């Protein structure tokens, strides 16, 4: 074994019928973790159920119930390799209710592939004021996914037929929007693709093909390989937000999540915030292999001693008891940008916050100041209200214990989305946190250390 390739997490985003799952499934089918026999079985099942065109998307539908409904819900983790990287795909679904999933999923991604449907009418629907293309791109940026690739998909559609004009029109429109969001458009490759036929996904299209005649850029895999390697904050203290907690027969309690900063290893004493519970880590596993240490970007399960499943919850944060352990917060100050709220927001507003894997109602207890969203300059102290388009510094108080951090110290734990009325009404970045001291319980194994 040579040096292990670096892991890169991808989130695939885009409007509901852009072809995300088909493109993703095709990638995994060709380059990754699914054996050919399983695919043949899927093909047969899909055909029998009259969903032949969902063949590759089917690859991503692990659950029987999901299959019959024809939509992908679970944020599934799937792997494939290129010459340079080991990619893990977090399949983020595109239906409106799943934006919450997307927020917690996206905070794990190093790179976003934004899949857009090129056919006339479909592209416009995705980018319209209430289309998901816009919202997904904005969320990805705010949640710290700084690298993006746009796949101009469904180029094989009979109304597009690999048209250079349509590709240029769609690319130009996307550039305008991506610039507004904060991306630098020349740095975002726009790759014409067909998730269904596989054209320009894995290799460049030859000159005899309608696309090859005018397109000389990279295929999707080449664009992925050309991404910058993510910088991993290994030297920071451990922060690992829990995504789930399992009880596994014969093993015990196994919290699961992604290491955001620092490292976790067997024998370490860890503290969970906001409860303050401390215990010893027995073992750490990734993809069913025991590890001596896991670092930033690794999705792991770890076994903890003498802890009941009831003591841990999704949204809790695990850290090193001896090195800046995480704590719950009494309140925090955040810079918030209001995206789409129909009315005025006053002090006392209490929407749901999605921060890392936590999902908790928080009150805007004080509107501290209103600012210019581009320059950050102060416009007004203690505004009476804020509305769509405004940026403000706000003091927030959570309705129940939660653990967050300042964005400058621990970026993945310092950004959040504000949800209300089933949509994302605002996004924010945490500037400072007032920590809460708690007397946490310590298990016997932790006390010995």
UniProtKB/Swiss-Prot annotation:
Location of region: G5: 194-196
Region (G3): 91-94
Region (G4): 153-156
GO molecular function ontology, one term from the record: GTP binding
Region annotation G1: where it falls in the sequence: 14-21
Subcellular location: Cytoplasm
Binding of GTP, residues: 14-21, 91-95, 153-156
Cross-referenced InterPro entries: EFTu-like_2 (IPR004161), G_TR_CS (IPR031157), GTP-eEF1A_C (IPR054696), P-loop_NTPase (IPR027417), T_Tr_GTP-bd_dom (IPR000795), TRAFAC_GTPase_members (IPR050100), Transl_B-barrel_sf (IPR009000), Transl_elong_EF1A/Init_IF2_C (IPR009001)
GO cellular component: cytoplasm
Keywords: Cytoplasm, Elongation factor, GTP-binding, Methylation, Nucleotide-binding, Protein biosynthesis
tr-type G domain location: 5-234
Function statement: This protein promotes the GTP-dependent binding of aminoacyl-tRNA to the A-site of ribosomes during protein biosynthesis.
Protein name: Elongation factor 1-alpha C
